[in-house]
């Protein structure tokens, strides 16, 4: 009986796919003369909960950094040295999860609801298969960190954080897959609810694991793992609830289909590789600053966290682009996808540019919050951080172009060329520039590059150049409309 029901649902999905979906298009408003306009209210109705969800992620990051600062400035620098690299590992190994929002949005726009639920289960199967790889990468902490030449005390702290954080990151990747489903069907408030539960749990467990149990820096990683596990359980309970079972057949599509898994990996791996390449460059950049000294590493980490006030909500707006573009394409309206995508890109760039300036203006009051007054490295870290915030403010508009364009391209399934562009710019432009600008002669990892010795300030000049080039390049890729020839 169940098999026949599944077959019937798949058949209905196939019939629906043959014709564009009827009804109004995503975020579309018709005026009195029948002309179509982008409904700004509809865009914001989707974007604002996603921005709020990103704000919750900011609170999570700030809470973690506050707990690290309570341990020591050295612990703060250690986490900063590996934080980006941890996310890179998750993006590369958890690529199938990042594809969920695109597949769900296009399936939802085409009214293929059971296909949308199937994308979630396929991602969860992929995460289960990849779990041993997460553990192996986590266990290789010393092999991965040794070549970067950290201060021994910083490396020891970073290694203590690395293993539990990476080994348990498959849980976080599974949570991303679940949230991608809710975002793809245009229900970001559910995503927000799951994130609030996870963040509140993480804050409580940080205090318990780090200080009361005495686990130190590793306790923060374990707190994140446990909190994400509870968030995953909560999201699954919602996904398998009566409403989703009735419309999406979420309880019927759990069986693994190899063809779907391969398709999702082909889409998800380059989709994960694009931000992974970007963050890999930032991870290496962060390690350069930590290699220079505790003050530079800590200042860079604090600035990164503060600029997330622009980045994370900007990511929320851009995520709305993935959903709106994907749903429009699923409905057979690629021209409308172009219009609504450009509106999202503009909103993202303007928001991030404005917030970047406000953060720099508020730096003198905010920076001291992240360091302990008793710490000898606190004062130089704060002084350097104030200068770095203005450099960071300079690239926020272009980072908005980068985020908005990349997420809209993701909604269209255009992921391979953008991944190659980001990989090339990150490793062939950004990393060499950061090395040349940061290190003086004899300080760096290699000797064949110019070594100007501008320190952390020089490294952030390289960030400014890189983001300006990257944002412009991806925006031109979107404007080229090459994505309109892609069919998933």
Q: In which residue ranges do the predicted regions lie?
A:
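Hydrophobic alpha-helical transmembrane bundles that constitute the permease/transmembrane domains
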Residues: 51-62, 85-99, 135, 139, ...
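Membrane-helix interface/capping residues of multi-pass secondary transporters
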Residues: 65, 73-76, 113, 188, ...
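Short alpha-helical transmembrane segments in multi-pass integral membrane proteins
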Residues: 2-49, 104-170, 201-204, 210-269, ...
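Small-residue hotspots at the loop-to-helix junctions and early N-terminal turns
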Residues: 73-84, 162, 221, 294-309, ...
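A late C-terminal transmembrane helix in Major Facilitator Superfamily
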Residues: 393, 407-434
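Helix-terminus/linker motif at the lipid-water interface of multi-pass membrane proteins
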Residues: 51, 55-77, 145-152, 208-215, ...
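Small-residue-rich hydrophobic transmembrane alpha-helices
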Residues: 76-135, 139, 172-191, 299-363, ...
């Amino acid at each position: 009986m169940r098999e026949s029901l599944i077959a019937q649902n798949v058949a209905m999905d196939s019939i629906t796919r043959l014709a564009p979906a009827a009804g109004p298009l995503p975020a579309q408003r018709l005026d009195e003369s029948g002309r179509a306009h982008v409904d700004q209210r509809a865009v914001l109705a989707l974007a604002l909960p996603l921005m709020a969800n990103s704000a919750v992620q900011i609170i999570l990051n700030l809470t973690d950094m506050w707990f690290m600062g309570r341990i020591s400035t050295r612990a703060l620098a250690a986490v900063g040295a590996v934080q980006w690299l941890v996310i890179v590992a998750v993006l590369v190994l958890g690529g199938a999860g990042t594809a969920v929002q695109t597949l769900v949005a296009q399936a939802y726009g085409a009214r293929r609801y059971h296909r949308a639920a199937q994308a979630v289960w396929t991602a969860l199967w992929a995460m289960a298969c990849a779990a041993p790889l997460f553990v192996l990468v986590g266990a290789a902490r010393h092999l991965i960190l040794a070549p970067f030449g950290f201060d021994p005390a910083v490396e020891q702290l970073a290694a203590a954080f690395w293993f539990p954080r990476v080994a348990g990151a498959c849980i976080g990747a599974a949570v991303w897959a679940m949230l991608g489903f809710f975002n793809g069907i245009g229900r970001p408030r559910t995503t927000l609810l799951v994130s609030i539960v996870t963040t509140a749990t993480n804050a409580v467990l940080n205090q318990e694991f780090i200080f009361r149990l005495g686990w130190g820096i590793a306790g923060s990683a374990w707190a994140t793992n446990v909190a994400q596990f509870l968030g995953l359980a909560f999201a699954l309970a919602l996904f398998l609830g009566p409403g989703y079972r009735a419309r999406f057949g979420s309880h019927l599509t759990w069986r693994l289909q190899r063809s779907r898994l391969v398709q999702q990996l082909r889409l998800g791996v380059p989709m994960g590789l694009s931000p992974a390449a970007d963050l890999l460059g930032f991870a290496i950049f962060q390690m350069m600053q930590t290699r220079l000294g505790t003050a530079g590493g800590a200042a860079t980490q604090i600035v990164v966290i503060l600029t997330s006030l622009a980045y994370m909500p900007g990511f929320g707006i851009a995520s709305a682009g993935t959903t709106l573009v994907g749903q429009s394409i699923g409905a057979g309206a690629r021209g409308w996808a172009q219009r609504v995508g450009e509106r999202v890109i503009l909103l993202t760039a303007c928001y991030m540019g404005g917030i970047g300036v406000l953060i720099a203006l508020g730096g003198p009051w905010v920076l001291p919050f992240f360091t302990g007054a008793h710490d000898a490295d606190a004062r130089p870290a704060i002084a350097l951080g104030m200068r770095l915030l203005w450099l960071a403010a300079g690239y926020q508009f272009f980072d908005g172009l980068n985020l908005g364009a990349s997420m809209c391209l993701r909604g269209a399934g255009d992921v391979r060329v953008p991944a190659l562009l980001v990989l090339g710019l990150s490793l062939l432009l950004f990393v060499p520039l950061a090395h040349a600008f940061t290190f003086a002669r004899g300080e760096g990892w290699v000797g064949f590059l110019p070594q100007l010795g501008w320190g952390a300030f020089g490294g952030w000049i390289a960030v400014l150049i890189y983001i300006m080039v990257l944002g412009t390049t991806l925006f031109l890729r979107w404007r080229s409309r090459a994505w309109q020839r892609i069919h998933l």
